[in-house]
Amino acid sequence: MNQERLYKVLLGPHVSEKATLLAEINNQVVFRVAADAKKPEIKKAVEALFDVKVESVQVVNIKGKTKRTARGMGKRNDIRKAYIRLASGQSIDFVDVE
């Protein structure tokens, strides 16, 4: 996988109450990922960019909600999230990332 693809796979961290709880209890982090990203690609991207060891990757597709607008019905974008379990003793500090 080339360097450019590594940066396109991970779109950014997903911050929510559930993600924070998982980070504290299960040593998991949650990322928003590209719609066409596969589990092995996501694992390689996280290991290369953050220099950590990944134990497992679970992916979920979330369909965008249908919303009513002034011009009729609209739809929010679909998103894909990856739940990444890190090896014990590993962590990702989002503040110190280059």
From Swiss-Prot:
Which protein family is named in the record? Belongs to the universal ribosomal protein uL23 family.
Keywords, sorted A to Z? Ribonucleoprotein, Ribosomal protein, RNA-binding, rRNA-binding
Note the NCBIfam families from the entry: PRK05738.1-3, PRK05738.2-4
Q: Which domain of life is it from?
A: Bacteria
Q: Which GO annotations describe the biological process of this protein? A: translation
Kindly list the organism's lineage: Bacteria, Pseudomonadati, Pseudomonadota, Gammaproteobacteria, Oceanospirillales
Write one Gene Ontology MF term: rRNA binding
**What is the protein name given in its UniProt record?**
Large ribosomal subunit protein uL23
The entry's function note states: One of the early assembly proteins it binds 23S rRNA. One of the proteins that surrounds the polypeptide exit tunnel on the outside of the ribosome. Forms the main docking site for trigger factor binding to the ribosome.
What GO cellular component entries does it have?
ribonucleoprotein complex; ribosome
Identify the gene encoding this protein: rplW
Tell me the subunit arrangement: Part of the 50S ribosomal subunit. Contacts protein L29, and trigger factor when it is bound to the ribosome.
